[in-house]
């Protein structure tokens, strides 16, 4: 069957829900018809006799239902159809929430519903007339009203019942009465304003209709003739050596006038309407011969600064400023023209064109006669200037009235960003109860017994994402037996994944970690508010998330001192890196911590561009990344020499010595300064050294492009940079042995593994299994330095817009001071080279290089073995000669089969 003829069928749950919706809607309509067509003579629950035909439209069953509802609830029974239909609709639309029922909220809604129904019934019973032969409030209303009247009288009972209604509404809907009052006030004020503007709008519309046909062909011809006459007169009077400023006024067609009035009266497009009134164009004067022109006298030097060019405005906008706001209500609020006090315009400039300026002197001939009725509001140019809001020039740019300048972000007063920049989390507590945990514990014991494993659950620790069950095994049962059954246990327990913790430090139990049915999100704001982060004195304090029991996990990068992060795509690795960087921004300023960020993907770390913590721009070119790592090696060596001369062991001791000298009023000069290195007559004073954090988002891409030299640079930094205050955070989504090599792992003991695809990847990053059983979305295994047992941590979540807020807050505090040598490289004499590495300029060609080139070009064979046999040299020497030929373009690079093509022609033979 073709795909076009196939019909998508519903699943079992969808069929049930859609069928339930249809049943509820039909039942609601049935009850409504039964109540509407109720007759007291029909058979019912409240009467036993029956004579004649049934008048109810829904038959005897409908008559019975209507009789019961009216008997018990009175007029409140007419609400029942709405309740039935709403229940069916909610169950149909929110079926995915059925499994996440908050029983406490459901109980509150039921209580609110009962308060509403019973309170309304009691009020109807006390104040409304009977309906048919039943009480207006039914039996329920009569019982409640008669029980309360002897104690509270009618007024007190009414107040209490109104209290029931208000409380029931809040409990049922969750809507605050303060919000209701606020919305009612807003609607009332808006309605009052609309009613106040209605007479003016009707008056304006009436005037527009009366004058719409006033413009005739003769008037248009007269207007065009007068405009040309004025233009000729102005040209004759204009001095040749000093061009005067021409102010252009362009006639707007009636369609534009009507469109503007329609749009303005509707209150929309305030800024666009204002631009229609005041639009500047300095390039259309020569292209519009039909436009009206008025030559103004030459301004003096002070007023000539405000050169406006050509001013275009509809000639029908001609009333005064007050008249425009009152009579021609264009929908523009006064805030576009005046400030909050309403006394002066928002925009000010001394060079603004003003009709009251003493430098402007008009002759009688300078005023254009606008006697022709271009439109209903056509008046003279001088009157139009009086009512038009003035424009200004800021830095050579014309700013229209109503176009407010973008607010310049003010520098925050606090030394560090506020936690209020992060969103307030919408916390949803885990609805699992102790009884359910007990049932799961018994189920775990039963499933283990199915595999002949006798174990007892001695502890249950529920967390935001997983729950750990601690098992006490029977004598003689190995923990590895449970580990081998992890997949079978996950299948039998209907769990996504099961992780077995064979060793729990300090306990003799085995841990079994099961994912929760409802997963909670760990928000960064919750973790930043903890005391462990706020009270930490280290400038390199970072937050990771929460552990399996919900406690925040706070670490110190200075004690790690380097971190290796790995995880597959979508496991939460990039979010984890952002959380660590943001927590450092919340803890330290640029005087304490500086960053070098390397982002081969050009997406993850570019958001931090512009923060004052950066030592250079975010590196996206991998050649510049190699230079940045070389600079770090050079800076590390410089700091080591400086600390050695200062007699301190690490950067902490160095900064303490500098701070102590400043407190005592002493100055410590740079002991490494040489007069030949600077133009200054004396050595500069030493200052505090910040810690440097190098963040590499995708380490595998950098190694693929730059090569193995990156591995050597990173290994050298990782070996020695701790005391110098330089720390590495390396992240990769390909945790293979060719990326995370043994040299890197040996020098970076701190690891962080997110979800990986196989056990091999887990062993590569952690040297043990476990990362393949993680749940993703920030679920990680954190291996602290000096330990062999990883801790399971649920990573904190921070959204992109929250990161943008923190970055904008730091950008408002200052600009970064970049060091150009980081990306461009250092001078040749100061180039940092690894052991055994030589600079390109220092490379010497082999003495046999010329002979080898002649041999290769003549024989057209560019293999290492041929050069080795010809000149009887070792393999390494022959390989270096071939590599030099490749660099010089003599031979090509190796192909897929290992062969090289000889590119250079043979040397010419001399006879």
Curated annotation (Swiss-Prot):
One of its GO terms (biological process) is cell division. It is a multi-pass membrane protein. Residues 182-911 are cytoplasmic. CDD domains: TrwB_TraG_TraD_VirD4. GO terms for molecular function: ATP binding; DNA binding; DNA translocase activity. The keyword RNA-binding does not apply. GO terms for cellular component: plasma membrane. Residues 403-427 are annotated as: Disordered. Consists of an N-terminal domain, which is sufficient for the localization to the septal ring and is required for cell division, followed by a linker domain, and a C-terminal domain, which forms the translocation motor involved in chromosome segregation. The C-terminal domain can be further subdivided into alpha, beta and gamma subdomains. The alpha and beta subdomains multimerise to produce a hexameric ring, contain the nucleotide binding motif and form the DNA pump. Essential cell division protein that coordinates cell division and chromosome segregation. The N-terminus is involved in assembly of the cell-division machinery. The C-terminus functions as a DNA motor that moves dsDNA in an ATP-dependent manner towards the dif recombination site, which is located within the replication terminus region. Translocation stops specifically at Xer-dif sites, where FtsK interacts with the Xer recombinase, allowing activation of chromosome unlinking by recombination. FtsK orienting polar sequences (KOPS) guide the direction of DNA translocation. This is DNA translocase FtsK. It comes from Shewanella oneidensis (strain ATCC 700550 / JCM 31522 / CIP 106686 / LMG 19005 / NCIMB 14063 / MR-1).
